[in-house]
């Protein structure tokens, strides 16, 4: 039902300025939430440098101050860090309730270490449910490290009468985790390559 999806529940980052402003100019409890979020950003993504998010007055722009550096617009951050802020802000602000977040390929624009930190942030700092579509072997490997991670595969299968179209079947893929672990095989070894060898001179 398309009417269920609108700007209030599709997160793009466009409302970050107004939400920060609302919290920072609101009650002490709201300001404390932002302070705690800045601490977690620092801990997981900025090597414990002090982080301050500033909705700059009359500019409709969010600035960020990292450590003792001069503040600057978050649009000048790398794409990966911008995406981290977009993907973690709502999840953390609403962490006292339980929500479901549907995220398409969260690994885009991020290096492997940042993807893992993002997953650790979700697992350790929130109690939401997250549904990802991904091509990342690093996300698949998280199934070995946490029993809160489930891998499922969607397979397109024709119906008995091909004229009736097709169905999507869902298969859980992490039930053989113990067997794979005993063989020294990680999920990424099954679904994606762990490495690529480039051979010159052919």
Regions found by a protein language model. Give the residues of each.
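Switch/communication elements of ASCE P-loop NTPase nucleotide-binding domains
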Residues: 41, 55-190, 196
